[in-house]
């Protein structure tokens, strides 16, 4: 699972998901990509599940790039705990994505194989996405 090696602070505010992605919204490495259409938090488990699904489908030949990294800690309070006494402890990591962000890129494979692999990865994501091809 992906997570930062070290961070400056253990806990973060939740923040809000408004606007669109101005960075990381163009294909840089591969020929095909999976692009988000709505804002969300994507967990490191979901990122890894998508990556594994794509790798298993492409087998040899193709190259995959993961363009997002989970750098936001999500805290969770223990079950049946009374209110107060501070914030919970960090439980898992998420990547904050906005509409337009590229999640995965792929190259070195025919379009039909890339489309199939990326659609399987898209089914692992908690949001609507689209398949795009670089010009």
From Swiss-Prot:
Its main location: plastid. Gene3D superfamilies: Ribosomal protein L10e/L16. One of its GO terms (biological process) is mitochondrial translation. The keyword Ribosomal protein applies. It is found in: Plastid, Chloroplast. PROSITE patterns: RIBOSOMAL_L16_1, RIBOSOMAL_L16_2. The keyword Signal does not apply. Keywords: Chloroplast, Plastid, Ribonucleoprotein, Ribosomal protein. GO terms for cellular component: chloroplast; mitochondrial large ribosomal subunit. InterPro entries: Ribosomal_uL16, Ribosomal_uL16_bact-type, Ribosomal_uL16_CS, Ribosomal_uL16_dom, Ribosomal_uL16_sf. One of its GO terms (molecular function) is rRNA binding. NCBIfam families: rplP_bact. Belongs to the universal ribosomal protein uL16 family. Part of the 50S ribosomal subunit. PANTHER family: 50S/60S RIBOSOMAL PROTEIN L16, LARGE RIBOSOMAL SUBUNIT PROTEIN UL16M. This is Large ribosomal subunit protein uL16c. The lineage of its organism: Eukaryota, Viridiplantae, Streptophyta, Embryophyta, Tracheophyta.
